[in-house]
Regions:
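Chalcogenol-based redox active-site neighborhoods
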Residues: 2-171
Length: 171
């Protein structure tokens, strides 16, 4: 296996990711994540719309919370766009956060149930460092035909993603 492992950093310290970060112009890998009502959400559930996958370690950190709020605003007037907020947080915690923050335009999804199936397929599972086992901060945009059209693996986990670039991908 000579695939190049993706890297990110946490407070300047390099962090290795499992697998290969998903690439632009490739079919989006199938995934199953868990919704707030504990039912499954799959790639097929988002078919026909642009999917903006906002991927991050936990909603309970400042930068992650900010990214969810900003993507919530960006999705407000775009009926052809579904924003998925994806973390390892339990659906209960995700639901509490979204209710407290008035987040209505984002679908919170958890990767807790299927042994990081999503994280492995998309190449966003951190394998070392203090956040090992959590998802690396990244953004993936999938077009209505199911093709990856934009990706960003944020180089430093404590930084916010490039919202404008992600938004351009859905216009």
């Amino acid at each position: 296996n000579n695939k190049i492992m993706a890297k990110t950093a946490f407070k300047g310290t390099p962090v290795t990711l499992a697998g290969e970060f998903v690439k632009v112009e490739t079919p989006a890998p199938e995934f199953t994540l868990v919704k707030g009502d504990l039912s499954n959400y799959t790639l097929k559930d988002g078919k026909g719309k642009y999917l903006v996958l906002n991927i991050f370690p936990s909603m309970d950190t400042g930068v992650c919370a900010t990214s969810v709020r900003k993507f919530n605003q960006l999705a407000a007037n775009r009926p052809n766009v579904t924003v998925l907020a994806i973390s390892k947080d339990l659906p209960f915690a995700q639901g509490r956060f979204c209710t407290t923050e008035g987040i209505a335009n984002v679908v919170p999804l958890s990767d807790y149930r299927y042994t990081s199936d999503f994280a492995q397929k998309y190449g966003v599972l951190m394998t070392d460092g203090p956040l090992a086992g959590l998802l690396a901060r990244s953004v993936v945009v999938i077009n209505p035909e199911g093709k990856v059209v934009y990706t960003e693996l944020v180089p430093e986990i404590t930084q916010e993603p490039n919202y404008e670039a992600a938004l351009k991908a859905v216009e």
